[in-house]
């Protein structure tokens, strides 16, 4: 049986201090009892710790958060890194909204607008860039009670989530903030 250990926001801590000697045991070729280490605070000298071969460690991190330290190289080499792109072009996201009773034209318009906004964010390489693009997860909640994705639902997301984010992103250009909020809410 396989097990997954997920660490969200893995870059929020000093990972060398959190993991200590266990960091070595995370490597795929250092798994199992042969690589076990004694437990520092154990009363029993025979107690040892190892990471089993059937445990997969997944660390999630938000690279757009500037207040966080970069992951140190000692940890970085123990993980494979995969970028997760915004999913506006995926059939899964579009089908999710369609299954929630969104109109196909509404879904198409939303995806086009968000892709254009993300292109704009990516072009702002000096202060923003690719890592700051807005993901599809903003549009996956608020539908649990049977609400259908429509213009009122979109307005709420834009006004409470996206517009404040744009204020941060384009802090030096209030005009650009407003233009993009209007574009997301408009018919064009």
Q: How does the language model describe each region?
A:
Residues 1-188:
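C-terminal regulatory/interaction module of P-loop NTP-utilizing enzymes
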């Amino acid at each position: 049986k396989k097990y997954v250990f997920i660490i969200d926001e893995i870059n929020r801590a000093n990972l060398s201090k959190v993991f200590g000697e266990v960091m070595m045991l995370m490597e795929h070729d250092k798994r199992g009892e042969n690589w076990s280490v004694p437990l520092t605070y154990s009363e029993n000298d025979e107690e040892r710790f190892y990471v089993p071969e059937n445990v997969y460690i997944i660390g999630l991190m938000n690279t757009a958060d500037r207040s966080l330290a970069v992951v140190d190289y000692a940890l970085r080499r123990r993980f494979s890194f995969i970028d997760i792109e915004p999913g506006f072009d995926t059939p899964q996201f579009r089908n999710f909204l369609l299954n929630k009773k969104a109109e196909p034209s509404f879904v198409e318009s939303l995806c086009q607008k968000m892709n254009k906004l993300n292109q704009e964010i990516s072009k702002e390489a000096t202060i923003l860039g690719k890592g700051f693009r807005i993901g599809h997860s903003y549009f996956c909640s608020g539908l649990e009670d049977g609400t259908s994705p429509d213009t009122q639902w979109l307005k709420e997301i834009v006004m409470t989530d996206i517009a404040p984010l744009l204020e941060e992103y384009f802090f030096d250009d209030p005009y650009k903030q407003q233009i993009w909020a209007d574009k997301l809410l408009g018919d064009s």
